[in-house]
Amino acid sequence: MRIAFLGTPAPAVPTLRALVANGHEVVIVVTRPDKKRGRGGELSPSPVKAAALELGLNVSHTLKDLYNVDAELGVVVAYGAMIPAAMLEVVPMLNVHFSLLPRWRGAAPVERAILSGDKETGVCIMTLEEALDTGPVHLEQRISIGEKTSSELLDELSILGAKALCEVVGSEELLKNADPQVGEPTYAEKLNSETFNLKNTESATQLARIVRLGRAFTFIGERRFKVLEAHALEHQGEPGTFTVVGGTPALVTSEGALALDVVQPEGSKSMAGSAWWLGAHLEPSSAHWG
């Protein structure tokens, strides 16, 4: 099948590679423009563009190029922008969405599932419509979330999504048949810096979920303090103070305490929370965070 692929970040790459490996003719790859990345600020391609060039595929940054390739089907995986309705008239499109629709339509479905304490998530292969993630579903696959980080979950979902997409594309029955989404929709709003700010008014369980997203931080005094790995403990104490359990420091919250397994103080490398605590010379009851 002649396929146009639209995608940008790393989780989209397994689907692109799977389509090629399964013998489909990827006639064009449309991805977002090169961006400045890293400390040097040099322009670098998106992960999808890098993979497409490695595979010898035709790459474009312009959706209008879809008019010129005579594709039979479009496949969209985290493209990073809305697809205009006019483009959906050029070629029918399938979208690989990393949630169990209609739950978590939108930009950050994996992270919102973790933050909400969902027990499971999954992948839906859906027909792309003009409205946001509303199309009928051709195939759904489920996985448990457990204590996985967002990075671990995305890695797993990207592989699952690639297999599911190829199953749909390879089956005339699955391609022709799709079920309307059933249930109350929820929306996965974009994350911002405040999403990752650990506050002592939250429960330890909720803070542990935030840590699993990566980028979690708080403040000790006026210094920014990153929390890389942590887990929730049962504890009663004054929120905003510290406690120590088995040599590991923990942030006392409104409900329980957050044990600091791996941290990165401002201006330092990452280290075990216990090692940081030994060198910090803080008093648990008088030191404050948040």
Indicate where each model-derived feature is located:
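A short, Lys/Arg-enriched amphipathic alpha-helix followed by its capping loop at the start of a domain
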Residues: 18-24
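A short, local hydrophobic-aromatic micro-motif
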Residues: 27, 94, 135-138, 228, ...
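Active-site-proximal cofactor/substrate-binding loop regions of enzyme domains
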Residues: 4-8, 14, 29-32, 37-47, ...
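Donor/substrate-binding cores of folate-linked one-carbon enzymes
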Residues: 22, 73-187
